[in-house]
Swiss-Prot record:
It comes from Staphylococcus epidermidis (strain ATCC 35984 / DSM 28319 / BCRC 17069 / CCUG 31568 / BM 3577 / RP62A). The keyword Nucleotide-binding applies. The gene is murE. GO terms for cellular component: cytoplasm. Carboxylation is probably crucial for Mg(2+) binding and, consequently, for the gamma-phosphate positioning of ATP. ATP binds at residues 110-116. UDP-N-acetyl-alpha-D-muramoyl-L-alanyl-D-glutamate binds at residues 30, 152-153, 179, 187. GO terms for biological process: cell division; cell wall organization; peptidoglycan biosynthetic process; regulation of cell shape. Keywords: ATP-binding, Cell cycle, Cell division, Cell shape, Cell wall biogenesis/degradation, Cytoplasm, Ligase, Nucleotide-binding, Peptidoglycan synthesis. Catalyzes the addition of L-lysine to the nucleotide precursor UDP-N-acetylmuramoyl-L-alanyl-D-glutamate (UMAG) in the biosynthesis of bacterial cell-wall peptidoglycan. Pathway: Cell wall biogenesis; peptidoglycan biosynthesis. The lineage of its organism: Bacteria, Bacillati, Bacillota, Bacilli, Bacillales. It catalyses: UDP-N-acetyl-alpha-D-muramoyl-L-alanyl-D-glutamate + L-lysine + ATP = UDP-N-acetyl-alpha-D-muramoyl-L-alanyl-gamma-D-glutamyl-L-lysine + ADP + phosphate + H(+). This is UDP-N-acetylmuramoyl-L-alanyl-D-glutamate--L-lysine ligase.
Length: 494
């Protein structure tokens, strides 16, 4: 597309050079800029990418969007605008033909449950033999093809490109985890959502948002906007077991469907049966009750299942077909995942990294603990430490607790474990500044019949170390190797 057409609907402060330039690609990453690229510079929290503009010109880029005129050598056009990231969103949606308008788009937000709900929606579509895409913590997936991702919600240009990829793959639907960071930073500008889903709101990310009020406001942006096309039929799915749903219902102009277990809602789960093999419940709806069976473990996953089913149903899919699909779903990797049931211990990994998430995790596994519950939890570096002692307190619901760092980054691992230990309510705990050593210790002290839970990371494949270097790390592989060495069996046996 010619740059003059690309900027036709955008008011700019100044243009230095000509807009008669062919633009084939838009990027905010200077490393990927090349001939035919339009580079958008921005002043971030830690880096001002305006300083890379000369680099992109040297790489062949002929046009840059900046918030001030720069001294650049070479044949380059500068487009000066007040808010470069807002313009980046507008340009990306224009160049890539407004991809979110071309499929059914689901947005899932909440402190806990985003990955599970979003993955369930994606898998329901696949079980119904429909092309589908997923974007979130576990990366980007079109049908069964997966690629890794850096953030839950990518920056605006990368996000638009992913939606375009889904459209090009003939996806009928795309489900996105929508983070509070992504909403607050405007990464979702221009995305047209058809259904917005809320799981819950508990303390997290206050290192970024500052207050729970600001955190909640960021979440609410998804429900008050859902895009700019007010003529489309759109829906909001809210968890009535969380009080914040009342506020979200008040700020959205769209039809609301509520679900719940403990609080009255339009859709409810009753007569619940739980085991480490899954859940069964009666799904009570405004138009009848339906038995549901799923391999997902834990009462909190019943809430996630209901949210996913309602979201897909709201866009016209038959509920019986959805329920049949749910019965066949594979559990979400790293979310209350039981590793190798043939082991004489129950070895479980989970992503729970907040006090609320840990409480729900322990609630889910405790009824099935035969002997001791050994619980390992980590605290991330450079994060909100005010939540840390409460995490330590919740962890002490277990018989034996292991405190470790989780992505310590530039923080002292010993400081992180000490913060967790401040909340300890008994003395049956130990601190390790090396998470892998903590995992091996958990297996070493476990006896047949014990349950070992490795919390905080799920299947995250790295530890973020000093200098923000990512070092390969897998809780599941470390735990399984230690278990096979102790109890025998398994492909990881030495």
């Amino acid at each position: 597309m010619n740059a003059s057409a690309l900027f036709k609907k955008i008011r700019v402060k100044n243009v230095i050079g000509t807009l008669d330039i062919q633009v084939d690609d838009i990027t905010t990453d200077s490393r990927t800029a090349k001939e035919g690229s339009l580079f958008v510079a921005s002043k971030g929290y830690t880096v001002d990418s305006h300083k890379f503009c000369q680099n992109v010109v040297d790489q062949g880029c002929g046009i840059v969007v900046v918030n001030r005129e720069l001294e650049l050598k070479g044949n380059v056009t500068q487009v000066v605008v007040p808010d470069t990231l807002r313009v980046a969103s507008l340009l990306a949606h224009e160049l890539y033909e407004f991809p979110s308008h071309q499929l059914t788009t689901y947005g899932v937000t909440g402190t806990n449950g985003k990955t599970s709900i979003a993955t369930m929606i994606h898998l329901i579509y696949r079980k119904l033999n429909k092309n589908s895409a997923y974007l979130g913590t576990n990366g980007f997936q079109v049908n069964e093809t997966k690629t890794k991702g850096a953030n839950t919600t990518p920056e605006t240009v990368a996000l638009t490109k992913k939606i375009k990829e889904a459209v090009d793959a003939n996806a009928e639907a795309m489900t996105m985890e929508v983070s509070s960071h992504g909403l607050a930073l405007g990464r979702l500008r221009g995305v047209e959502f058809d259904v917005a889903i809320f799981s819950n709101l508990t303390q997290d990310h206050l290192d970024f948002h500052g207050t729970m009020e600001a955190y909640g406001h960021a979440k609410s942006l998804l429900f008050s906007q859902l895009g700019e096309d007010l003529s489309k039929e759109k829906y909001v799915v809210l968890n009535n077991d969380d009080d914040f749903s009342d506020y979200l219902a008040s700020v959205t102009p769209y039809e609301v469907f509520t679900y719940g277990i403990t609080h009255e809602a339009q859709f409810m789960a009753k007569n619940i049966k739980e085991s480490l093999q899954g859940v069964e419940f009666e799904f009570c709806t405004p138009f009848g009750s339906f038995p549901v069976k799923s391999p997902y473990v834990g009462r909190f996953n019943i809430s996630n299942i209901m949210a996913a089913m309602i979201a897909v149903w709201s866009k016209g899919t038959n509920l019986n077909e959805i329920i049949n699909a749910v019965t066949e779903l594979e559990p979400v990797e790293g979310r209350l995942e039981v590793l190798d049931p043939s082991l004489p211990i129950d070895l479980i990994i989970d992503y729970a990294h907040t006090a609320d998430g840990m409480n729900k995790l322990i609630d889910a596994v405790q009824p099935f603990v035969k002997q001791k519950l050994i619980f390992l939890v980590g605290m991330a570096g450079e994060r909100d430490l005010t939540k840390t002692p409460e995490m330590g307190r919740v962890a002490c619901r277990a018989d034996y607790v292991i405190f470790t760092p989780d992505n310590p980054a530039n923080d002292d691992p010993k400081m992180l474990t000490a913060e967790l230990a401040k909340g300890a309510t008994h003395n049956n705990y130990i601190e390790f500044d090396d998470r892998a050593e903590g995992i091996r210790h958990a297996i070493d002290i476990a006896e047949p019949g014990d349950t070992v839970v490795l919390a905080s990371k799920g299947r995250e494949p790295y530890q973020i170390m000093p200098g923000h270097v990512k070092v390969p790390h897998r809780d599941d592989l470390i735990g399984l190797k230690a278990a096979y060495q102790k109890f025998g069996g398994g492909p990881l046996e030495d």
